[in-house]
């Protein structure tokens, strides 16, 4: 009997929620709303391209020698995965370090507003999700860092929208504690007028307030503020189209 790859069980990840008490399927949900400058030409070609690059751990510096010939562990940076999404006249670059896996990327555009969402996909939707221990989950919400860099794009190629529905993380959106998740934020004000950005991390299978955190960032009318975004009303998720 042939079992589709998406349904095959493996020891470290599963296509349905784990029954184990101490295991968690951690997910991340990143929502961004960009208002472009008034004079920016309207471009509603969303999902023009998505590229993913993982920068592996940095090689130890050969010039640095320790006394016992072993390389120092502290010099090795954890790998960062970058997603570059081009669409709607923007190139949005997101970097994720020590975070849950991104499995779904979607965009929508309406006039001068471009929205994007990057998220994990909860088990049971045909994508595997690793189950990690409670301790690993606590470390993840402390260590996960998301960086963002938004540039202007003059890409003219057509949208490459996928026909499947946008899959989501299923993380609950109740009020949770803040954690400093957002790292560097860079915007090109030539085309970006306002920016609202929300990140949420949590257990995708069961509500666990201890494992749910959020962070937010706003850049409105030239001034930045952190932690102030209400992600539930930030964008209309029903209008998003799948880019991957």
Swiss-Prot record:
Report the induction information.
Answer: Expressed in the early phase of the viral replicative cycle.
Q: Gene name?
A: OPG001
Composition bias, Polar residues: 37-53
This one is known as Inactive chemokine-binding protein
User: Quick one: a GO cellular component term?
Assistant: host cell cytoplasm
Q: Which coarse location class applies to the principal site listed for this UniProt protein?
A: host cell
Compartments reported by the entry: Host cytoplasm
Please note every region of biased composition (Acidic residues).
Answer: 54-77
The keyword Cell inner membrane belongs to this UniProt entry's keyword annotation: no
- Which residues does the annotated region (Disordered) include? 1-79
Q: Which UniProt keywords apply?
A: Early protein, Host cytoplasm
Task: Describe its function.
Answer: The protein is truncated in this vaccinal strain and presumably inactive, because the lack of signal peptide prevents the protein of being secreted. In the wild-type viruses inhibits host immune defense by binding to host chemokines. Binds host CC chemokines (beta chemokines) such as RANTES with high affinity, but not CXC or C chemokines (alpha and gamma chemokines).
InterPro entries annotated for this entry? Chemkine-bd_vir (IPR009173), Orthopox_35kDa (IPR003184), Pox_vCCI-like_sf (IPR036540)
Recorded family membership: Belongs to the orthopoxvirus OPG001 family.
């Amino acid at each position: 009997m042939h079992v589709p790859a998406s349904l095959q069980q493996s020891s470290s990840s599963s296509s349905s929620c784990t029954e184990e008490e101490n295991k968690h399927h951690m997910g991340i949900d990143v929502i961004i709303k960009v208002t472009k400058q008034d004079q920016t030409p309207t471009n509603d070609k969303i999902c023009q391209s998505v590229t993913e690059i993982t920068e592996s751990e940095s090689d130890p510096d050969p010039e640095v020698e320790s006394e016992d010939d072993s390389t120092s562990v502290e010099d090795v940076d954890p790998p960062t995965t970058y997603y570059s999404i081009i669409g709607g006249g923007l190139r949005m670059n997101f970097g994720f370090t020590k975070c849950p896996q991104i499995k779904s990327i979607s965009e929508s555009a309406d006039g001068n507003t471009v929205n994007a969402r990057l998220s994990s996909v909860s088990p049971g939707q045909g994508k595997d999700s690793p189950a990690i221990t409670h301790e690993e989950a606590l470390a993840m919400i402390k260590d996960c860092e998301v960086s963002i860099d938004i540039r202007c794009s003059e890409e003219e190629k057509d949208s490459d929208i996928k026909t499947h529905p946008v899959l989501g993380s299923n993380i609950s959106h109740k009020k949770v504690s803040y954690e400093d998740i957002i790292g560097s934020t860079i915007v090109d004000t030539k085309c970006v007028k306002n920016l609202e950005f929300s990140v949420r991390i949590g257990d995708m299978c069961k509500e666990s307030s201890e494992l749910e955190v959020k962070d937010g960032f706003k850049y409105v009318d030239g001034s930045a503020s952190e932690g102030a975004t209400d992600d539930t009303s930030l964008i209309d998720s029903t209008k998003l189209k799948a880019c991957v």
